[in-house]
Amino acid sequence: MTAAPLTPDPTHPRRRRKSYTFFSLGIYAEALLFLLSSLSDACEPPPPFEAMELKDKPKPHYAIGEIIEYTCKKGYLYLSPYPMTAICQPNHTWVPISDHGCIKVQCTMLQDPSFGKVHYIDGRFSWGARVKYTCMNGYYMVGMSVLQCELNGNGDAFWNGHPPSCKKVYCLPPPKIKNGTHTFTDIKVFKYHEAVIYSCDPNPGPDKFSLVGPSMLFCAGHNTWSSDPPECKVVKCPFPVLQNGRQISRTEKKFSYQALVLFQCLEGFYMEGSSMVVCGAKSSWEPSIPQCLKGPKPHSTKPPVYSESGYPSPREGIFGQEFDAWIIALIVVTSVVGVIVICLIILRCSEYRKK
């Protein structure tokens, strides 16, 4: 009797595939662990620096003990004895690591111009730095007042312009004015701070010319006078009339430039506006003529000003300085009497003890 052939179990192949899968995963895990262990014994790429860069092409990882070499970037110079190499340490760090060995390329140091001075704004003259020029009083600048140290394509530093110069200040004659003149009309060139004075010509008409504006001009800069010249013109303000009031200054029939008028209201009226007006350059009163309104003057809502008369100062209080003097005298007298009483009490006590 022969045994029946065994029927293959359909689950066996699945077990083989599962064991094969576990075997593959183990190989992958060992490879990953090996890779991680190898990477754990390496340094990452060194950090970038502003002044220096790697001499060779950077790599993703570096072995322990591996040495890298740096070089200064364009626009920087090597400063001995700082090292330009770094070593991958067992703790996965780079030592030493610093860009102190590379300094910026410097421009040539600039000298002070004649009658002027150069100021280093940033306190240095390497590329990126700026300088500012100034001239002495009585001199003006020709050229750029601010220069900057820049870098060209070859890595060399240069100033972006030529240094300026300081020239002596001169002024051409000031402008002539209509109906007037100025002093020193025969001078063709004026030095720094030299001045002229303007005046008006006599007017053949009934009203005189008034000098409106500054009477004196001086040479303030190269071909620059201190202000615009004045004008000579007729300025005539209308006769000021104040209803329910009167002038308290001298009365005149004509009021020319800068004539001053003071006003006062009649009894039973109060003034609204300024009590003083001046004849302005446009033949009008400045400020406008006030008004005198009937009735008592309204009380001001503003707090009293102590500096004005009629109000006590904070130190005076309600009773004033006289009351303060009485208080001081009373304190002095009281103190003297108190001392005398104490002395008498002490004397009586000593006599009582002797008895």
UniProtKB/Swiss-Prot annotation:
The lineage is: Eukaryota, Metazoa, Chordata, Craniata, Vertebrata
| One Gene Ontology molecular-function label | cadherin binding
- Name this protein carries in UniProt: Membrane cofactor protein
GO cellular component terms? Answer: acrosomal vesicle; basolateral plasma membrane; cell surface; extracellular space; inner acrosomal membrane; membrane; plasma membrane
Extract the signal peptide range: 1-42
Record's Pfam families? Sushi (PF00084)
Q: What does this protein do?
A: May be involved in the fusion of the spermatozoa with the oocyte during fertilization.
Q: Where is the Sushi domain?
A: 43-104, 105-168, 169-234, 235-294
- Please indicate if the UniProt record lists Manganese as a keyword: no
Q: Where in the cell is it found?
A: Cytoplasmic vesicle, Secretory vesicle, Acrosome inner membrane
Q: Which residues get glycosylated? A: N179, T301
For side Extracellular, which residue ranges? 43-326
Name the InterPro entries for this protein.
CD46, Compl-Cell_Adhes-Reg, Sushi/SCR/CCP_sf, Sushi_SCR_CCP_dom
Quick one: a GO biological-process term for this protein?
Answer: regulation of Notch signaling pathway
Q: Which residues cross the membrane?
A: 327-347
| Annotated S-S bridges | C107-C149, C135-C166, C171-C219, C200-C232, C237-C279, C265-C292
Q: How is it modified after translation?
A: O-glycosylated. N-glycosylated.
Q: Which organism is it from?
A: Rattus norvegicus
- Per the record, the domain of life is Eukaryota
The membrane topology term of the UniProt record is:
Single-pass membrane protein
Please state the gene responsible for encoding this protein: Cd46
Q: Which UniProt keywords apply?
A: Cytoplasmic vesicle, Disulfide bond, Fertilization, Glycoprotein, Membrane, Repeat, Signal, Sushi, Transmembrane, Transmembrane helix
Tissue expression notes: Specifically expressed in testis. Within testis, present only in elongated spermatids and spermatozoa (at protein level).
Q: What residue ranges lie in the Cytoplasmic compartment?
A: 348-355
Oligomeric state and interaction partners are given as: Interacts with C3b. Interacts with C4b. Interacts with moesin/MSN.
